[in-house]
C-alpha cells in the first residue's frame, strides 16, 4: 500500500532530569558540569503557544544539604526546594527510619584515634600495624568470619598524603607486621604477595585498566586453609622438605589505599575495615567513604 506522509511537530523535550550524587559535583568538576548544564537546559526547554518558556524539572539527590542553595545556583542558576523537610524526630523522617542497633543490625562502629604529641605519619604506621596484625589474629581464631577485617582500606584527602602512606606500608608497616613484638600478642602477618603485603591503589594516578583489575581483586576473600598462620607454616615446611606447596592464581589485597575515587562505584560486600586519615573535608565524605565498608551489616559489620 502507498505510504501516507503527514507533517509532524517537534517531539517534546524531556520534562524531568534526575541528577544523582550531586555532592560530588564540586570544584573543577562543578565548573565543567555547569557549562554543560546550560546547553542541556537550552535543548530541553520549549515554549507554549503563548510564548511562555517551559524548563525541565531537576531532581537531585545528595549526601548532604549543606550549602545546597549555593551549589544549585552555581550549577543550574535555579532556586532549590529541599525534601524531606526538617522534622521533630531525626530518627523518623517519614521517608526513612533509623534502625536500632542490635545483634541482627550491628551497624558500623567509628573509633577516633587522638595521637597528641605524635607525628601523623607515626600514628598512621602504628595504627595500620595494629589493624593488620589484629586481622591475622582474628583469622587464626575465627576463620572465614574474619575475612572482612583482613583487607585494610585507607582513605586519604589528597594524593600527596596517600603517596606518603604507600611508602610507609611497604617499608615501616611491612617490617613491623613481619616481626611483631613478643609482648604484643599478635602473630606474624605474612602478606599475600610472596610474603610481602599486597597493596592496591584507587587514585587518579593509576591507569583505568589497573583500576578495573583492582576493583575485581577487592572481591577476593582470604582462605583460612591458605592464609592462617598454621597453613602458612605448613607450606613453608613443605617447601623446605622439597615438596611443592599449594598455590593460587590470584591473591587478595592486604591493603588498599584510596582517595575520593572510593566514594562512588565501589560496592564490595566483603570489606569491613577502613582507616580514615585526617579530617574529611565535609560530612558527605564521611557518609560516602565510610559506607564502602560494612555493606553487609548482618554478616560483616563495618569498623
What name fits each language-model region?
Residues 75, 90-121, 188-256, 267:
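Conserved motor-coupling elements within RecA-like helicase/translocase cores
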Residues 21-29, 40-75, 85-86:
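Conserved helicase ATPase motor motifs in RecA-like P-loop NTPase domains
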Residues 1-12, 258-260:
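Conserved RecA-like ASCE ATPase "motif II neighborhood" in helicase/translocase motors
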Residues 262, 266-279, 301-303:
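A short beta-strand element within the Helicase C-terminal
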Residues 21-29, 262, 279, 293:
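Conserved Walker B
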Residues 292-303:
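Conserved segment of the helicase C-terminal RecA-like domain
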Residues 13-16, 53-59, 251-255:
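Loop/turn-to-beta-strand initiation segments
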Residues 56, 65-176, 200:
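Conserved interdomain linker/interface between the two RecA-like ATPase lobes of SF2 helicase motors
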Amino acid at each position: 500500500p502507498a505510504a501516507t506522509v503527514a507533517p509532524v511537530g517537534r517531539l517534546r523535550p524531556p520534562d524531568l532530569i534526575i541528577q544523582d550524587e550531586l555532592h560530588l559535583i564540586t570544584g573543577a568538576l562543578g565548573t565543567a558540569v555547569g557549562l554543560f548544564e546550560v546547553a542541556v537546559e537550552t535543548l530541553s526547554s520549549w515554549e507554549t503557544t503563548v510564548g511562555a518558556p517551559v524548563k525541565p524539572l531537576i531532581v537531585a539527590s545528595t549526601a548532604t544539604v549543606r550549602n545546597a542553595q549555593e551549589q544549585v545556583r552555581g550549577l543550574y542558576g535555579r532556586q532549590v526546594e529541599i525534601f524531606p523537610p526538617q522534622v521533630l524526630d531525626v530518627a523518623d523522617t517519614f521517608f526513612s527510619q533509623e534502625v536500632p542497633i542490635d545483634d541482627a543490625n550491628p551497624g558500623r562502629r567509628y573509633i577516633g584515634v587522638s595521637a597528641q604529641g605524635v607525628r601523623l605519619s607515626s600514628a598512621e604506621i602504628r595504627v595500620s600495624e595494629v589493624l593488620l596484625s589484629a586481622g591475622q589474629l582474628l583469622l587464626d581464631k575465627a576463620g572465614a568470619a574474619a575475612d572482612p577485617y583482613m583487607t585494610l582500606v585507607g582513605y586519604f584527602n589528597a594524593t600527596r598524603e596517600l603517596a606518603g602512606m604507600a611508602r610507609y606500608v611497604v617499608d615501616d608497616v611491612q617490617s613491623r607486621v613481619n616481626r611483631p613484638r613478643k609482648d604484643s600478642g599478635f602473630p606474624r602477618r605474612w602478606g599475600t604477595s610472596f610474603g610481602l603485603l599486597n597493596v592496591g591503589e584507587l587514585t587518579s594516578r593509576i591507569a583505568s585498566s589497573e583500576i578495573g583489575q583492582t576493583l575485581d581483586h577487592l572481591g577476593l576473600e582470604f582462605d583460612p586453609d591458605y592464609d592462617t598462620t598454621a597453613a602458612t607454616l605448613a607450606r613453608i615446611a613443605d617447601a623446605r622438605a622439597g615438596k611443592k606447596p599449594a598455590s593460587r592464581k590470584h591473591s587478595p589485597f592486604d591493603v588498599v589505599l584510596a582517595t575520593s575515587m572510593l566514594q562512588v562505584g565501589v560496592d564490595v560486600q566483603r570489606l569491613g575495615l577502613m582507616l580514615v586519615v585526617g579530617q574529611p573535608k565535609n560530612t558527605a565524605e564521611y557518609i560516602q567513604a565510610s559506607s564502602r565498608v560494612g555493606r553487609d551489616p548482618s554478616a560483616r559489620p563495618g569498623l
